[in-house]
Amino acid sequence: MRTVLCVMSLAAVCACGTTERLTQPRASFSHVVAPSHYHVATLPTLGGASQGGGINNPGWVAGYSGLPDGTRHAALWRNGSITDLGTLGGTQSGLHSNVQWPGLNNAGVVAGISHTAALDTLGEAWSCSAFMAANGHVCLGFVWQGGVMTALPTLGGENGFAAGVNDAGRIVGWAETPVHDPTCNAPQVLQFRAVLWEPQSARTTELPPLSGDSTSAATAINARGQVVGISGECDVAVGRRSATHAVLWDRGTVTDLGSLGGAFWHTPMAINDRGDVVGFSNPPGGDIDADNLRAFLWTRAGGMKDLGMLSGDGLSEALDINNRGQIVGVSCGDVCQAVLWQDGVLYKLRDLVDPAFSGLLWSARSINDSGQITGRLIDQGTGQARTYVATPIVTTP
């Protein structure tokens, strides 16, 4: 399947644009002075390509790095140095895709996915195959803390997936149940549901889908314990018909967040501590291959609003939002470009960087409360994908 879609496999990348003011009605943004300049630092690798998926307020970055043998491990960058987080016994961990994962909190706790040494007895591709090479092994969510990677339990099935962690150490994602669901899209066999893990108390809580749906998955959690994710059919997590509805779980209640008018691919990617949600949604007429997704911002006051894209592009995704209301993501045409939405204005991040910088800022996946951004750039000299941190330089009058 062709998927320019960043959540599944960003095979195509998006064209450039310039600063654009959004013309459709939008939810309000808190006032932030637009940065006049960003300094971009490229981070070291473990010997191969890399990308950043999350950045916390101390400026630490979680993501993945390739190794010289071609395998890929989850990684944590602290103060310019890289740490290999290892695996759960398999060959690979971390995520290769345009998502804001692995999750990382302000204490440096990382949540993500890893292959294990065990084989999947049902021959499922599971969600991991969308994010790293499928090898027939069971894939589980993990929490990494204090130098130790620990597997998170499933709901009775074989596979699991961790996507986000808040400062209380509560982790969200999705996991298989023991239920064989005949409606699943092959090769998926088992039903999967959204999960809230609380490792400190060893509690695992299933988060139900909307009434009438069979499947759910959670993608992010904020400091207040509000969780966002998807509800739908047993298809490809976290997209296609599995994402028939974008949802919010809050104090035991699941709420439909609406859509931009299409039938599927309505996927929240992040929620800030004010409860503002960003992600992507199919517009009317959108197809199953998600070639024309639209970035959205959802607020309780304004509902879901289309954030637009760079001129000439056909797809956009909002991947993270900080507590100041700044949003980062991608806008895609022939190639993808990292973008920033701020005060109702869409910026191509490259336009805010020193012209002498020669890399292609391919994606912006995460932004902290200081405005630092991480994601993936392409080194124009070597063609290698690398993790970057863009730090705003605020000019005082």
Task: Enumerate the predicted regions with their spans.
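Residue-level hotspots at or immediately adjacent to binding/recognition sites across diverse folds
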Residues: 17-397
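Positively charged n-region of N-terminal signal peptides that target proteins for export
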Residues: 1-4
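C-terminal motif of bacterial Sec signal peptides marking the signal peptidase cleavage site
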Residues: 12-15
